[in-house]
UniProtKB/Swiss-Prot annotation:
Catalytic activity: tRNA(Arg) + L-arginine + ATP = L-arginyl-tRNA(Arg) + AMP + diphosphate
Short sequence motif 'HIGH' region: positions: 127-137
Gene Ontology molecular function: arginine-tRNA ligase activity; ATP binding
Keywords associated with the record: Aminoacyl-tRNA synthetase, ATP-binding, Cytoplasm, Ligase, Nucleotide-binding, Protein biosynthesis
UniProt superkingdom: Bacteria
Subunit text: Monomer.
InterPro entries tied to this protein: aa-tRNA-synth_I_CS, Arg-tRNA-ligase, Arg-tRNA-synth_N, Arg-tRNA-synth_N_sf, ArgRS_core, DALR_anticod-bd, Rossmann-like_a/b/a_fold, tRNAsynth_Ia_anticodon-bd
Entry protein name: Arginine--tRNA ligase
Organism: Ruthia magnifica subsp. Calyptogena magnifica
The family this protein is said to belong to: Belongs to the class-I aminoacyl-tRNA synthetase family.
Localization of this protein: Cytoplasm
GO-annotated biological processes: arginyl-tRNA aminoacylation
Gene Ontology CC annotations of this record: cytoplasm
């Protein structure tokens, strides 16, 4: 309906242009759903937008626009509201058509081709394989997976990718942590990984030969001097003593943790088309090649034995090291190579979803893209805020090194996948989130996911008791009470809500809409009877709630949440 209103407004503005009232008619005309039924179904601010250019006050211009609209059977009336809004009241016959459209299109209703098949590479989570995913990763996972689903629903082709940080010093710290647990030394570095999962991995390498010959007791003295230098010495000594067995331990640790991450994500309903290894960039020499390319372009200089990239030339606040004085490439060098590799795959758009703690990393990544002569606007970076998890009113701590973090798996086991997926995306991604476990587990109207699922289950219960209504000779005009009008108005909003959620990367908009729709249904359920003697009214009401049910299913599916038939 919005498209039709835009069309008739455009025709009216063209007439005013021909009459000399306007110099030119705009291409884009904004139409919004009204919040108050007394203000109509849709409203446009076009008169206020064009008032200054026309030399007319908004209400006068609005009247001229209305006078040129002509007759339209889809519109009951058009009114002007202060300070110049044009409000459209849609005819009841037009409004109720949405019910048949939803039922006929079923799971396809709401889908669009706005994206026209544009290809998007969406990278998200990409947590280091140094431990299980925690609840913070869970929010990024739920957000990323839902954004991907929404974009696909409006016509984009989306590939989900996980960047595996399986190279560098953190991997060595992981290997030494596992080995020290294997040899059961009493001394353990404070900056090693200490979770129970480290012990579990260590048990799996008990059969490897010669692993009982390792580091002298003197060299494992706890935190001797500088902690970072100490663990680096342990790593170097471990590599020397173990030889090829060191890589066996490292590979075992990475593969075990990565396998757990993959299982966790699949069970959470988060699927990836591609897993990209950082180590592959090292093995292929791409990181080295990129630094050489930047060097040849004059963007690299040497200082204090290290190689620095002049990112300040491209808007960054500081220059950045790409090769340390020991000759090792930094994570930033790998990230530059990775992003270049992404750009060369031919996607129309590249989206990274990062934790908000990576905010300072945006400028340097954008700088590297510009330096390599690519369009940095092709890359969008979305940030997700931290999660505060509360259990029994107490905030839980999350720290990978200490091993005391709450894992995503533990959260899912406690509240269930549906509650976790829904709660994670219920607030804007840029806002801090307080995850209330007690609320997520409650079976009450205050729990939004329960509230929505209960609406679906209630509809299923009614339909089980009723004979299947026939679309033949259906008369939807009998749906004329206030509750029915509100439900029909909400159903008419779904397409716009879906597109807005997708194009603005805002799943919470769809989640909040579903909660509102469920609320209107519950009110209708409490105040109305469905299995009435009047067949015409009975069938119309059943078709209305079938349409509501379909929208609840469609919306929940996009959010990665189930729609149970009973609760």
């Amino acid at each position: 309906m919005k498209e039709q209103l835009q069309k008739i407004l455009k025709q009216s503005l063209n007439l005013l242009e021909n009459e000399g009232v306007l110099e030119s008619a705009p291409e884009n005309i904004r139409i919004d759903h009204t919040k108050d039924k007394t203000q109509g179904d849709f409203a446009s601010n076009i008169a206020m937008v064009l008032a200054k250019r026309s030399g007319l006050i908004p209400k006068v211009l609005a009247q001229k626009i209305i006078d040129n609209l002509g007759d339209n059977t889809q519109i009951d009336k058009v009114q002007i509201a202060d300070p110049g809004f044009i409000n459209f009241f849609i005819s009841q016959g037009e409004s109720v058509q949405i019910i048949e459209q939803i039922i006929n299109q079923a799971e396809h209703y709401g889908k669009a081709d706005v994206g026209k098949g544009q290809r998007i590479l969406l990278e998200f989570v990409s947590a280091n394989p140094t431990g299980p995913l925690h609840v913070g990763h869970g929010r990024v996972a739920a957000y990323g997976a839902t954004v991907a689903s929404l974009l696909r629903a409006v016509g984009f082709e989306v590939d989900n990718e996980y960047y595996v940080n399986d190279a560098g010093r953190q991997m060595d710290i992981l290997a030494i942590s596992v080995y020290l647990r294997y040899v059961e030394t009493e001394q353990f570095p404070d900056n090693g990984y200490k979770g129970d999962y480290i012990f579990d991995i260590a048990k799996k390498i008990s059969g490897v030969k010669k692993l009982d010959i390792f580091i002298s007791q003197r060299s494992v003295k706890k935190n001797a001097g500088n902690k970072e230098k100490h663990i680096d010495r342990l790593i170097a000594n471990c590599k020397f003593q173990l030889g090829h067995d060191y890589k066996k331990i490292l590979d075992l640790a990475i593969n075990n943790i990565l396998s757990g991450i993959k299982i966790d994500l699949v069970e959470f309903g988060v699927k990836y088309q591609q897993w990209f290894s950082e180590q592959s960039l090292m093995d292929s020499g791409l990181s080295k090649e990129i630094v050489k390319k930047l060097q040849d372009s004059g963007y690299i200089y040497e200082k204090e034995g290290a190689l620095w990239f002049k990112t300040t030339d491209f808007g960054d606040d500081l220059d950045r090291v790409v090769v340390r004085k020991n000759g090792k490439y930094t994570y930033f060098a790998s990230d530059i190579a990775y992003h270049l590799e992404k750009f060369e795959r031919g996607y129309d758009k590249i989206i990274n979803i990062w934790g908000v703690d990576h905010h300072g990393y945006i400028a340097r990544i954008k700088a590297s893209i510009k330096a390599l002569n690519h369009n940095s606007n092709k890359l969008e970076i979305l940030l997700v805020q931290f999660v505060n998890l509360f259990r029994n009113g107490k905030k839980a701590s999350m720290s990978t090194r200490s091993g005391s973090f709450i894992t995503l798996e533990e959260l899912r086991e406690e509240v269930g996948n549906d509650a976790a997926r829904f709660f994670y995306i219920l607030s804007k991604s840029g806002q801090h989130m307080n995850f209330d476990l007690d609320l997520a587990k409650s079976k009450s109207n205050e729990n939004p996911v329960f509230y929505i699922q209960y609406a679906h289950a209630r509809i299923c219960s009614v339909l089980k008791q009723a004979k299947s209504p026939s679309m033949v000779d259906i008369d939807l005009s009998v749906l004329n009470n206030e509750s029915e009008a509100l439900l029909i108005k909400e159903l008419n909003r779904y397409k716009d809500i879906l597109q807005s959620s997708a194009l603005n990367y805002e799943p919470h908009v769809l989640a909040c809409y579903l909660r509102e729709l469920a609320g209107h249904f519950h009110s209708y359920y409490n105040n109305s009877k469905f299995l009435v003697d009047d067949d015409k009214l009975r069938n119309a009401r059943l078709f209305l709630i079938i349409a509501v049910k379909q929208i609840l299913v469609n919306g929940l599916n996009l959010l990665g949440v189930s729609a149970p038939d009973s609760m």
